[in-house]
Amino acid sequence: MFHLDEIDNIFEAASRSRLFKNREVLLPDYVPLELPHREAEIKRLAEVVAPALRGERPSNAFIYGLTGTGKTAVTKYVLRRLQEMAKARGASVSWLYVNVRQRETPYKVLADMGEQLGLRVPFTGLSIGELFSRVVRRLSRLEGVYIVVLDEIDFLVRRGDDVLYDLTRVNEYLQRARASLIGITNSVKLLDSLDPRVKSSLGEEQLVFSPYNAEQLRDILSQRASAAFNEGALEEGVIPLVAALAAREHGDARRALDVLRVAGEIAEREGAPKVTEDHVRRARLEIERDRATDVIRTLPLHGKLILAAILRASESSPEGRATTGEIYDAYRQLASSLGLEEVTLRRASGVLGELDMLGIISSRVISRGRYGKTRVVELAVSPDTVINALSEDPTLGGVVQGLGRGGRPKGAQ
């Protein structure tokens, strides 16, 4: 039995941490006073939004780059400074921030905007059109410039871009207020997939954020580590290792900071005097497992079913691999066993591409000589992680139980 004094010991140990000074500076939503290696991007975005200080509507902007390249941090950094300067000059400038992925639906996106404007929004009961009208009416009674940031905007586009189109036209309904949009996405191809009307409006200004290299990541990690950890809490090789690992994963600074934080938490739990390279490697595996589980949980049913099909199709392969055709055949069998209508091969291939982008699988095209080329797929995370996450879906419980746990994923330990 777990006794209260054991809980007290855990809390007591945490309160007198020898390692952490302020772990909050390693969290994803923390915006530091300085953003190393993003000076050009800060300058460019500041130029885009500067007209707001004159009461003019800034151009809409579209910001894209891979995960962890500083898009959100730079946007918040610039807009906070803009609002401070506007206040000092007596100008009326405000900004709203909505993470579209966290809000999940167009209704919740509009509701979040409305609430930030002081509007009381019922949880349900309104149509999208009525809610949009209420947000517009609220804005029309206000004055000044409003900059709306839609982070991870691709999650809104996937549900259709009608709301996005309406938002790009919002100034047609305003008299005293002005509004502009900043869309942030990880997908460099998203803008091309939009309705031409939305594309021309939202893409008035475009900013591209390149991945950080290992040296830049070391600078970022060193800056945050000096504020997050007590002096001497990190072994000498910790920051170079975290930077090197993150540089291999597309220069993702957010992931690098997560790994450093979790490595510190593992060391703290174990009562270690310092954070070591071993703590870093274990933190990376722990984060991969937790992230993969969260991603799989949020997949639509057929996405989960295709993932289960990868497990089934790759069971007989010593390398844990399967071709697209083998996976689709396994998917059709699973869909049939559940009485579900199957998606097309083209759609299934699209789902595989999305899973690849999310880091759950990896795929590549190989040559089979006179038989031509084919795409082979393998898991990029542990099969156990996939099976455990899929098992949480009651629809798939019976199917998943019949899957083996063979097939070593690429990079798994």
Predicted regions mapped to residue ranges:
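Mid-core helix/loop region of P-loop NTP-binding domains shared across ATPases and GTPases
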Residues: 2-20, 27, 58, 101-220, ...
